Amino acid sequence: MFYYLYDLYFNHLDSLRIFSYVTFRALMAGLTSMLVTFWFGHKIIDFLYGLKFRESVRDDGPKSHEIKKGTPTMGGLLIIGSLLISVLLWGNLKNPNVILLSVFSLSFSVLGFADDYMKSVKKIKGGMRARTKFILSILISFIFCILFFYYTGTTGQTGKISFQLTDLFFPFIKGPVIALGIIAIPFSILVIIGSSHAVNLTDGLDGLATGTVLISVMTLGVIAYFSGTPIVANYLNIPYLPGAHEYSVFLSALTGALFGFLWFNAHPAQVFMGDTGSLFLGATLGMIVILLKKEILLLILGAIFVSEALSVILQVGSFKLTGKRIFKMAPLHHHFELGGLKETKIVIRFWIIAVILAIISLSTLKIQ
């Protein structure tokens, strides 16, 4: 809004030119969303508690989780609300992808909310039917992938090499590696849904998903700024994507919202994000890496999410084939819990690993 007003009415005033700078708007977006989260945090928590939107724990889960029963859930409303307010104020609303990204995130948050509502209020065990949730996830992803490819265009530039936006890039390798062509759409849907459900599986300990997603979002914010700045993109020999630096404003707003939410979600958690938060956070990560041409990099940056999802796949597959379990419990963080590690130690160690993965991910921009 501020950028739009400046561009429309005040672009002749040098003193207000700062509102056109991406760096300033990104910093202010992060600060705004964090303050909004702090301000409304307790109010939203009390509101959720009053409506009996409360967490239930799995019957076969760790005994230490019994204390979490009754904690307000659907805290993702606080994250998505703070994010959208901040983007509305500081984002470039003339950039269609900023609008699309916001609506895309909101769509997955609504899907997660419906799932949480069925579990917490309607007391339907397991919430929304898995098939229904899966089909809706595919439908949302398909619609927005088509829209993003339409508004973003089809070609780009990396150094002296031209590329199609349907091409696939690999870390440590210059230029596009695989031309996906028409397969780009189903591949993108796979990335979004995989990321969404992987983050959802990671959300099992106080602050675990919040902190790890936060680190990934901050990293992608840096990459987005570099990708949208031609001098930096050409220097690093990464895909130059016009307008991509505006994603850094969106990601900064999301960073601030996550920092604010972590204040309430850290152990012992006063609120859980629920599927309302985890589904949209994972889906947003997936869409961002698609837009930045960093789909494969997500395997490094989001290795924690990948390992959590993989542990579930291996556990289920092993039990069906052999009748034996590989882990004490899946997802992976529960395996460590039952192994005797305290919840806070697991969370902090996962955060440390996430920081290391972020550093490695950023290093791939130059090491190629």
UniProtKB/Swiss-Prot annotation:
Its main location: membrane. GO terms for molecular function: metal ion binding; phospho-N-acetylmuramoyl-pentapeptide-transferase activity; phosphotransferase activity, for other substituted phosphate groups; UDP-N-acetylmuramoyl-L-alanyl-D-glutamyl-meso-2,6-diaminopimelyl-D-alanyl-D-alanine:undecaprenyl-phosphate transferase activity. It catalyses: UDP-N-acetyl-alpha-D-muramoyl-L-alanyl-gamma-D-glutamyl-meso-2,6-diaminopimeloyl-D-alanyl-D-alanine + di-trans,octa-cis-undecaprenyl phosphate = di-trans,octa-cis-undecaprenyl diphospho-N-acetyl-alpha-D-muramoyl-L-alanyl-D-glutamyl-meso-2,6-diaminopimeloyl-D-alanyl-D-alanine + UMP. The keyword Cell division applies. Its cofactor is Mg(2+). GO terms for cellular component: plasma membrane. The keyword Acyltransferase does not apply. The chain crosses the membrane at residues 31-51, 73-93, 98-118, 134-154, 175-195, 213-233, 249-269, 271-291, 296-316, 345-365. Its EC number is 2.7.8.13. InterPro entries: Glycosyl_transferase_4, PNAcMuramoyl-5peptid_Trfase, PNAcMuramoyl-5peptid_Trfase_CS. Pfam families: Glycos_transf_4 (PF00953), MraY_sig1 (PF10555). It is an enzyme of class 2 (transferase). Belongs to the glycosyltransferase 4 family. MraY subfamily. Catalyzes the initial step of the lipid cycle reactions in the biosynthesis of the cell wall peptidoglycan: transfers peptidoglycan precursor phospho-MurNAc-pentapeptide from UDP-MurNAc-pentapeptide onto the lipid carrier undecaprenyl phosphate, yielding undecaprenyl-pyrophosphoryl-MurNAc-pentapeptide, known as lipid I. This is Phospho-N-acetylmuramoyl-pentapeptide-transferase.
